[in-house]
Amino acid sequence: MSWQTYVDDHLMCDIDGHRLTAAAIIGHDGSVWAQSSSFPQFKSDEVAAIMKDFDEPGSLAPTGLHLGSTKYMVIQGEPGAVIRGKKGSGGITVKKTSQALIIGIYDEPLTPGQCNMIVERLGDYLLEQGM
């Protein structure tokens, strides 16, 4: 299965008639493996800052998580495994696997819990597959 299929079928899936705003699978080095057409253009230093927070949990809290032109307030996650961010009525979930970052961006009416479930379910599956 291609990485794009994981994005299209698993991350951008339909939940009660709603879906994520954008999603991507990005390598730890910042390379894009696959992304939805709506995924924001991001900078490599933004991915580096996300990776640093997985190694040093809490490092993003003072500055926020930046992706594209959007700043998210970092909220509770799972140190070393999941980073969650909030901005207005939407937010972001980032799940780290051994080789990639699974990223989902949402806005109402999708809930934070639904975004977490979508992103973390795929991330957990990829971890089980050794990825």
From Swiss-Prot:
Keyword Hydrolase in annotation: no
Cytoplasm found in the keyword field: yes
GO MF annotation, one: actin monomer binding
SUPFAM superfamilies: Profilin (actin-binding protein)
One Gene Ontology term, aspect cellular component: cytoskeleton
Keywords (A to Z) from UniProt: Actin-binding, Allergen, Cytoplasm, Cytoskeleton
Domain of life of the native organism: Eukaryota
Entry's localization field: Cytoplasm, Cytoskeleton
A Pfam match: Profilin
Matches recorded under SMART domains: PROF (SM00392)
Reported function: Binds to actin and affects the structure of the cytoskeleton. At high concentrations, profilin prevents the polymerization of actin, whereas it enhances it at low concentrations. By binding to PIP2, it inhibits the formation of IP3 and DG.
Family statement: Belongs to the profilin family.
PANTHER family, alphabetized: PROFILIN, PROFILIN-3
Oligomeric and partner information: Occurs in many kinds of cells as a complex with monomeric actin in a 1:1 ratio.
Protein's UniProt name: Profilin-4
Organism: Hevea brasiliensis
